[in-house]
Amino acid sequence: MSRVGNRLLSIPSGVNVEVEKSLVKITGKLGTLSVPFDSKKLSVLNKDSMVIVKRANDEKETKMLHGTTNANINNALIGVNSGHTKKLKIVGVGYKAAVNGNKINLNLGYSHPIDLEIPAGLNVTCPQATEVVITGADKAVVGQFAAVIRSKRPPEPYKGKGVAYSNEVIIRKVGKTAEGSKK
């Protein structure tokens, strides 16, 4: 039994939900998001300020789609109402970030700076030179852009230098020591 799929999703005040044939349009103060679903295997109902996702049968694929669709609709409801946020921290001597217009400029120890285009619908800020905050309505786009920034210099296990999520735990390794080596 899919516990995620059977959750009833409450619609926050100020959010409008429209169910079309195979698309759920969710509109709120931060924009409009559309969540597609398979109308042959699932049905989405909008009743009494609640969104209900039901499945047609108990096949394995249908159960998987049931939970995924329910989670995607829930992410969209939260996104258009309060938004999603990812925070990145930059660790390393001379490593820094700055936002210039619709681009983010990263200096990560390479011989050249890295410029990345900020996707539409995202708000990227740098409260400090070693901190990046990404906010937006679409959770997938926020997470994907944070992953792209992190991939430019992932944290290394010896000194922890690189770009990491603010809540990420970096497993550290012990480096080579002069005392421990045998000659």
Swiss-Prot record:
Gene3D superfamilies: Ribosomal protein L6, alpha-beta domain. This protein binds to the 23S rRNA, and is important in its secondary structure. It is located near the subunit interface in the base of the L7/L12 stalk, and near the tRNA binding site of the peptidyltransferase center. HAMAP family: Ribosomal_uL6_B (MF_01365_B). NCBIfam families: L6_bact. PROSITE patterns: RIBOSOMAL_L6_1. GO terms for molecular function: rRNA binding; structural constituent of ribosome. Belongs to the universal ribosomal protein uL6 family. Keywords: Ribonucleoprotein, Ribosomal protein, RNA-binding, rRNA-binding. GO terms for biological process: cytoplasmic translation. It comes from Malacoplasma penetrans (strain HF-2). Signal peptide: none annotated. This is Large ribosomal subunit protein uL6. Part of the 50S ribosomal subunit. GO terms for cellular component: cytosolic large ribosomal subunit.
